[in-house]
């Protein structure tokens, strides 16, 4: 008996505290009924020393996802890689297939999550991670609950959203008062004056196309007429679209990046958002890059819990909201830095194209657009 006890003690001495705590978190262990305290999880996270994150490109979002967390938890280094949404899936799936487990958390758009990461079994349910002080209390979240894009409400958590302005226009050349419907863009006077973000790839062009395709007052007929309009231009480069609009070459831009649009406006260029309530058919809301997933076999299981708790805290959400200029779904996060027209109103009903129902229609919509453009 004494020999068995000595062998157990020797093995235990070889197990790091972080690994031991992770083992205790596994279902089916003897202590599964008595989970560790938050203080114990933070201590284990500090011993892990790192959390690895993939997030959107851009210096402001990089700072929002790293600096405040590093200041609060200097013992936990954030290794963040900025990537475009269409790069994330191939990278992660290839790594997991090779049993390379290097990433903990991904902050990205719902299209990347729903079309690639979830079906590729690259991610795990989020709710077991939400055990910190900022994620247990749901009373400050819109509607008193967390929002997920996937139907099981397990894998892709949305933490911010914004109302998509119908389009951006040069206020020196275009009067907003003449627009009452999306169909007003079909007026011949706008021929040769419109850019539409490439609708065949993720972004504002496909987002608007999703709205048009699914709206009973617009539909395929409107899309055919708009997409075959004389001299409509469909760039892939958001900056080029905004530069065209600012210089007046194409004074109406449908679907450019709202983050870049806000940067152009802040520089004093004559660009404005068309108010979402201007057009009778309305517009839509989207999460943009404001959603997260937890990667399967994450290498830092405790650090990722601490990181997610901070990101979803009032402080973490304020940093994100300031960087993107979009509203957090937390009601206790200030919105004075966000354009009022981009803030979803609690008494309004919006078509939320971040949800799985709409994301699953994207391939059908893309094929329809291709058929129209090929004629």
Task: For each feature predicted by the language model, list its residue ranges.
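Short, low-complexity, charge-dense intrinsically disordered segments
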Residues: 6-19
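Conserved C-terminal helix/tail region of periplasmic/extracytoplasmic solute-binding proteins
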Residues: 34, 345-375
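Short, polar/charged alpha-helical segment
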Residues: 35-46, 52-77
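Extracytoplasmic ligand-binding site segments that recognize negatively charged/polar headgroups
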Residues: 55-67, 79-93, 101-242, 246-247
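A ligand-binding cleft/hinge motif common to bilobed small-molecule-binding domains
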Residues: 112-116, 252-272
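A bilobed periplasmic-binding-protein/Venus flytrap-type ligand-binding module shared by bacterial periplasmic
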Residues: 166-173, 210-214, 287-300, 319-320
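Periplasmic-binding protein-like
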Residues: 223-228, 232-235, 268-296
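Mature extracytoplasmic/periplasmic domains
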Residues: 290-353
